[in-house]
Amino acid sequence: MLNLLVLALPLLVSLVHTAPAPGQALERAGIVGGKEAPGHKWPWQVSLRCLDQYWKHFCGGSLIHPQWVLTAAHCFGPEKADPLYIRVQLGEQHLYYQDRLLLVSRIIVHPNYYDEVNGADIALLELEDPVNLSSHVQPVTLPPASETFPKGTRCWVTGWGDVHSGWPLPPPYPLKQVRVPIVENSECDMQYHLGLSTGDNIPIVRDDMLCAGSEGHDSCQGDSGGPLVCRVNGTWLQAGVVSWGEGCALPNRPGIYTRVTHYLDWIHQCIPRES
């Protein structure tokens, strides 16, 4: 990694995670137990790139407005990242084959973010120019604040990350998808306490988080920040942002996502109404 990127992006070490140590909470987001996504099924899917000999994919994201991308704060860390060294790719099915990289003018990390396990793992990227929308490039709809995404709701997570812990996605680097069920927060928190010394009265899964996944079907390391979407009354809504978890697709360890409804006010404050 270039020295300038070490300074600008202190948490890009997540790019080189291998198999996680037991009990270790890690950044997420490859696809385990899934399959290649049909072409342009997810037109809001974003690949974030940093300069490391080439513009290398390091995180996912979602287009939520013609000029704004939603992603995870841990992709950048609590320190201010320099948008000069970040690019965005939209409308791509396979990484690196037809790159048309877009410039980023601003990176906004949530002010309460410290690390992903403590919540507020959410960030916004403002593009230098609005994108031209098409059948291949469309923003995803944000949910209403009242949407709870109840237990058992079947949703989809997408990304270009590891296909198993420590097993990177092989060429031709297709976008992967997997269907995952929503797990109730209280149940997810109970599962994460199993085998840990953390007291049951100390929450692991917080109110601003959302759990989804089952054994053999999950997100994984290498593509954090990507979208978890659920179809509600015929409309795809972004329920979560891929955040963290223990291992990949392990029993009693669902993937943990930033709950988008918890941060709707912050998102709307950051994105000017006239933009």
Curated annotation (Swiss-Prot):
**Quick one: a GO cellular component term?**
extracellular region
- The main place the protein resides is secreted
Q: Which residues are glycosylated?
A: N132, N233
What InterPro entries would the database entry show? Peptidase_S1_PA (IPR009003), Peptidase_S1_PA_chymotrypsin (IPR043504), Peptidase_S1A (IPR001314), Trypsin_dom (IPR001254), TRYPSIN_HIS (IPR018114), TRYPSIN_SER (IPR033116)
Organism listed in the record:
Sus scrofa (Pig)
Q: What is this protein called?
A: Tryptase
Per its database record, what is this protein's job? Tryptase is the major neutral protease present in mast cells and is secreted upon the coupled activation-degranulation response of this cell type.
Q: List the disulfide bonds.
A: C59-C75, C155-C230, C188-C211, C220-C248
- Subunit and interaction comment: Homotetramer.
E.C. number: 3.4.21.59
Q: Where is the Peptidase S1 domain?
A: 31-272
